[in-house]
Amino acid sequence: MEPCELQNELVSAEGRNRKAVLCQRCGSRVLQPGTALFSRRQLFLPSMRKKPDLVDGSNPDGDVLEEHWLVNDMFIFENVGFTKDVGNVKFLVCADCEIGPIGWHCLDDKNSFYVALERVSHE
């Protein structure tokens, strides 16, 4: 999606999500509209798979993603689970179908939770 399209369709003038954020696989609601800030930061996320396969760390395949929703409090999420620690990172997964990672949380920064726009859908 082009930056201008992104700004108009998904990001409000205040930089917040205009639409609800949903799991791409099962449609479960991850975030309500207006609860996250748009952020550009390069983060590596492993390829999408079920939660138990994420914590073994044996599969380095994945993507460097740049566009994210930034949430500063884990209790803002509607339906998100967290993996066990993988180094100093916890990956975010859908709490209903356990597919992920849809996002990333560094344990060094207690107030930053990133959800990759490419790993979720919007409604």
UniProtKB/Swiss-Prot annotation:
PROSITE patterns: MSS4 (PS51796). Residues 9-123 form the MSS4 domain. Zn(2+) binds at residues 23, 26, 94, 97. GO terms for cellular component: cytosol; membrane. The keyword Acetylation applies. GO terms for biological process: post-Golgi vesicle-mediated transport; protein transport; small GTPase-mediated signal transduction. SUPFAM superfamilies: Mss4-like. Pfam families: Mss4. GO terms for molecular function: guanyl-nucleotide exchange factor activity; zinc ion binding. Keywords: Acetylation, Guanine-nucleotide releasing factor, Metal-binding, Protein transport, Transport, Zinc. Ubiquitous. The modification N-acetylmethionine is found at residue 1. The keyword Transport applies. Interacts with RAB8A. Guanine-nucleotide-releasing protein that acts on members of the SEC4/YPT1/RAB subfamily. Stimulates GDP release from both YPT1, RAB3A and RAB10, but is less active on these proteins than on the SEC4 protein. Might play a general role in vesicular transport. Belongs to the DSS4/MSS4 family. This is Guanine nucleotide exchange factor MSS4. It comes from Rattus norvegicus.
